Amino acid sequence: MQTFHKDNLFSLKQSRGLRVSFSARSAFTLVEILVVISILAILTVITITSINFALSSDLTRGASRQVQSYLAGARDRAIYAKEPRGVRFILDPANPTAVTSMIYIAPSPNWEQGIIRLERTDADSNSVADSASVFYVRGDGTDWASLASRDLIKQGSRIKIPGDDSGTWYVIDVDGSGVSGGTELLRLTVPYRDPGTSDPTEVIAFTPGSGPSTYLLELPPVILSGEEPTLLPNNTGIDLDRSFLPASWRPPIDSTHVSRGGDSQPGKAGVDDDSSGGADDNGELLWPGTDDYRLYSSQLDLMFSPRGSVLGSEAGSGKIHFVLDTLENIQSSWLRTTDYAEGDRVQLPARLAYAFTPYDRVYVCKTGGTSAGNPAVFLITGTRNEGDIVADGSVRWETQLNATPSLLTLFTRTGSVNAYPMYFDFAGNVPPDVFKYAETGEAAK
């Protein structure tokens, strides 16, 4: 048995004192708990934001890889089959400015029914030609009206005259043509190569027994047998308004090719958007900050030749830049005189000088309120630095880099498809050179 000693008594007192001291600090104070909760809340918000951003970026990169693979597949099919093959981009039913699925296509047989004759312009129908140039092709038994009613004669369609090996292909001016009812008249975008054999004042360009009577009319491609549409990853799409598209894909700004949106008026209903002295005129169609939107064709087709290059008018620009983004971002264009809440996110409207190109900044609402009427506040060089605050009516926006979209570039002369990051230009450069990496071949540092 251990001998009791006064030192033992001292040690016992010390240990009891320590236990008392420890037991007195066994819980947090209310202030400490509130501080911890606040820190955890801040960390949670930061973490969730980072996760959402990472997930969005992963989604668009996955969509970019899928489109890249699909285009490469169409090119390979054309080379292997030694016949043109292509891809049809299918619009999203709920968002007509986004593509959310694709399908493989092949060319249709050329249409050659009936016979034709060539005519000069006679705008006032007085049987005297307005000029010696031969612009019109009149059909007899061609059934072009039936084709037009099925949307098979489209802007950019071509006709070969005559229809044999000596013929030349011409682009059809669909808007200037008359193909309805009993009228079967196509207008060429350029005059026919031969001025005709009749007097230049005659409407019919060739005398009987001379001139071409055969033709080949190019029809839109058809879906390959057995193919089903391939969907892009959920919540992603090709942003047509912000992609650098072929001219033949870009709808003209008129009442036929622009939807007036929910208010059924050009621009913002009841507002003189363009300061022209009147509200709701056609000059305000597709005005920045309004709910108007472009009406794209239901047949956005890219065809590859057996050599691997892109065929048709779509090849004219040399390159096509596809912008893949989340559907939320695609639909988040800034609107004038609209209420916004904290956390809302907007993009610069893809209108006027900023049509068919992405913008390298986005804006997150930090103070809710009502927006003003001019998107130019987002273009001031002093508000393009990351973290800058943009004053827009009673709304305050924070500038952030637009890092969610992915870029995919198709080089039409070679058929190669490459993915590139979007270039975040310097704050002082407006408009920004967002396609710098894609067009110079540089990689992001």
Residue spans for each PLM region:
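N-terminal helix-rich module
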Residues: 2-10, 28, 46-49, 53-68, ...
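Tryptophan-rich substrate-binding surfaces of secreted polymer-degrading and adhesive proteins
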Residues: 332-400
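Exposed loop/turn and edge beta-strand positions of beta-sandwich/beta-sheet ligand-binding modules
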Residues: 33, 298, 359
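A cross-taxa feature marking solvent-exposed loop/turn segments within ectodomains of secreted
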Residues: 41, 80-82, 358
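N-terminal secretory signal peptides that target proteins for export/translocation
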Residues: 1-23
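Residue-level "contact hotspot" at macromolecular interaction interfaces
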Residues: 23, 149-152, 339
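Conserved polar catalytic motif of the HATPase_c/GHKL fold
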Residues: 73
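N-terminal single-pass transmembrane signal-anchor helix
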Residues: 23-52, 70
